[in-house]
Amino acid sequence: MKQKGKMSGKKLKQMFVTYTFVLPDFIGLLVFIIIPIIYSFYMSLYDWNFANIKQFIGIQNYVTMFSDSEWWQSLGRTFKLTLLYVPALFILSILFAVLINYVKNEKAAGFVKTAFLLPYSITSVIASCLWMFLYMDRSGFINVFLKAFGLKGEKFLGSTSQAMVCIAVVLIWINLGYNIILFLSAIKDIPYSYYEAAKLDGANSWQTFWKITFPLLKPTSVFVLITSVIASFQCLDLIMVMTGGG
């Protein structure tokens, strides 16, 4: 009986420690995600005016939204941006992570990682302003560069298709470094014995990547894909600054 009591007490202590570590993340999730979502849904059921007078209208706001053709057009453009941005970011992130992993000089590897991660530390609005100077019709750096070689300048933000590509480039520039760090950490966690066994079996670098590295990156890949899709739906500030919402 004493042994059983000790075991149950030990188990309770382990559970307490576990929940103590989880509690801060749960509080953050509750305060910054769950409660705002619930409150936003509550607000969507009312008609609000500037006098802060509300009138309950049920799901009328959702009916209005789904019957608006502009909303469907905006949603379609968002999906196009997602299909353009997410695969490109995913491929580039893995590619650069693998290449950096081959760099033996720690200082050089650290410099490269810092250079890639730096854009992630600035806000989307600042990043948008920086890239707007590059995309400007006449004095933008890209057009100046093109004209220096006798090429015709482009109105990069002047059409929907070109603007979408430009926005995707900015999103990739911002988030590439963060995803590289994630993939690089996952690659370094792969036991080196796997690669030694593959080398003994005569596998080349391409076969090693497809048979060992890429499959073992699945958890990180899923996380990166999910966060990338979310990011493509949360870039309104970037779009408003660069295109004015058009």
PLM feature spans:
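Short, Lys/Arg-rich, polar N-terminal cytosolic tail immediately upstream
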Residues: 1-13
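A structural signal for multi-pass alpha-helical bundles of membrane permease subunits
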Residues: 10-246
